């Protein structure tokens, strides 16, 4: 079973996070940031990854530290759960429509960290949530998983729909990339290591 758990405590946040890549049990997500909980629930459903998160952060300041630290911890758990990445597809991509918006994600579990984020989020806030934190979250995930992650909103009007399309596309692309393929012997690289 490919799984991992991490506890990350800083002067700003306390995060407990666990994942299971091969289980579709119900996820429990409580970050203290309602919009992030909603997006992580969508990610869990569409990636078919069991995700449990308990986060306490300095949300009286704003949600920045909590969102970023949850992304860091999720990335570290993904890296550990994937271990040597033997027999996984490695690459994944997905287009996801959400009403008038269309999101796209392509990723490579290459061991090299990179984020391309191309999304015009015209509404700077959704409730109390600063929409610029979406990019911060994905930056933290990509750099701590050590993946190439490309996210793009091709078009759309509603900022909530755009972000939702990105999280769903990320989940679906990640599921494709982490799926074990019996045709792949060892790691999916001519280098022999990822």
UniProtKB/Swiss-Prot annotation:
CDD domains: IGPD. PROSITE patterns: IGP_DEHYDRATASE_1, IGP_DEHYDRATASE_2. Keywords: Amino-acid biosynthesis, Cytoplasm, Histidine biosynthesis, Lyase. PANTHER family: IMIDAZOLEGLYCEROL-PHOSPHATE DEHYDRATASE (PTHR23133:SF2), IMIDAZOLEGLYCEROL-PHOSPHATE DEHYDRATASE HIS7 (PTHR23133). GO terms for molecular function: imidazoleglycerol-phosphate dehydratase activity. This is Imidazoleglycerol-phosphate dehydratase. Its EC number is 4.2.1.19. It catalyses: D-erythro-1-(imidazol-4-yl)glycerol 3-phosphate = 3-(imidazol-4-yl)-2-oxopropyl phosphate + H2O. It comes from Listeria innocua serovar 6a (strain ATCC BAA-680 / CLIP 11262). Transmembrane segments: none annotated. Coiled coil: none annotated. InterPro entries: IGPD_sf (IPR038494), ImidazoleglycerolP_deHydtase (IPR000807), ImidazoleglycerP_deHydtase_CS (IPR020565), Ribosomal_Su5_D2-typ_SF (IPR020568). Pathway: Amino-acid biosynthesis; L-histidine biosynthesis; L-histidine from 5-phospho-alpha-D-ribose 1-diphosphate: step 6/9. It comes from the Bacteria.
């Amino acid at each position: 079973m490919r799984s991992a758990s991490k506890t990350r405590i800083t002067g700003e946040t306390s995060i407990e996070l666990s994942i299971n890549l091969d289980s579709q049990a119900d996820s429990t997500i409580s970050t203290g940031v309602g919009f992030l909980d909603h997006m992580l629930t969508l990610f869990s459903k569409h990636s078919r990854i069991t995700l449990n998160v308990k986060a306490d952060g300095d949300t009286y300041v704003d949600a920045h530290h909590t969102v970023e630290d949850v992304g860091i911890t999720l990335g570290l758990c993904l890296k550990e759960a994937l271990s040597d990445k033997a027999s996984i597809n490695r690459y994944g991509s997905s287009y996801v429509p959400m009403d008038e918006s269309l999101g796209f994600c392509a990723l490579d579990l290459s061991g090299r960290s990179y984020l391309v984020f191309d999304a015009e989020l015209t509404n700077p806030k959704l409730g109390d949530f600063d929409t610029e934190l979406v990019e911060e979250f994905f930056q933290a995930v990509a750099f701590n998983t050590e993946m190439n992650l490309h996210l793009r909103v091709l078009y759309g009007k509603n900022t909530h729909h755009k972000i939702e399309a990105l999280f769903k596309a990320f989940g679906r692309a990640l599921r494709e990339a982490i799926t074990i393929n019996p045709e792949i012997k060892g790691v999916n690289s001519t280098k022999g290591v990822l």
